[in-house]
Amino acid sequence: DQDDDIENVITLIETKENQTEQIKXQXXQLLQD
Protein backbone atom coordinates (compact mmCIF):
# COMPACT_ATOMS: atom_id res chain seq x y z
CA ASP A 1 0.00 0.00 0.00
CA GLN A 2 1.49 3.29 -1.07
CA ASP A 3 0.27 5.33 1.89
CA ASP A 4 2.16 2.99 4.19
CA ASP A 5 5.32 3.48 2.15
CA ILE A 6 5.00 7.25 2.44
CA GLU A 7 4.44 7.04 6.19
CA ASN A 8 7.48 4.80 6.56
CA VAL A 9 9.64 7.29 4.70
CA ILE A 10 8.35 10.16 6.82
CA THR A 11 9.05 8.18 9.98
CA LEU A 12 12.57 7.43 8.80
CA ILE A 13 13.21 11.09 8.05
CA GLU A 14 11.91 12.16 11.45
CA THR A 15 14.06 9.56 13.17
CA LYS A 16 17.16 10.78 11.34
CA GLU A 17 16.36 14.38 12.24
CA ASN A 18 15.97 13.44 15.90
CA GLN A 19 19.29 11.62 15.84
CA THR A 20 20.94 14.65 14.26
CA GLU A 21 19.56 16.89 17.00
CA GLN A 22 20.84 14.51 19.67
CA ILE A 23 24.29 14.43 18.09
CA LYS A 24 24.37 18.23 17.91
CA UNK A 25 23.41 18.46 21.57
CA GLN A 26 26.08 15.97 22.57
CA UNK A 27 28.70 17.83 20.62
CA UNK A 28 27.70 21.11 22.15
CA GLN A 29 27.98 19.63 25.60
CA LEU A 30 31.43 18.30 24.80
CA LEU A 31 32.52 21.72 23.60
CA GLN A 32 31.20 23.41 26.72
CA ASP A 33 32.96 21.09 29.16
Swiss-Prot record:
Q: What's the protein called, per UniProt?
A: Unknown 31.6 kDa protein from 2D-PAGE
Q: Which domain of life is it from?
A: Bacteria
Q: Any miscellaneous information on file?
A: On the 2D-gel the determined MW of this unknown protein is: 31.6 kDa.
Taxon lineage: Bacteria, Bacillati, Mycoplasmatota, Mollicutes, Acholeplasmatales
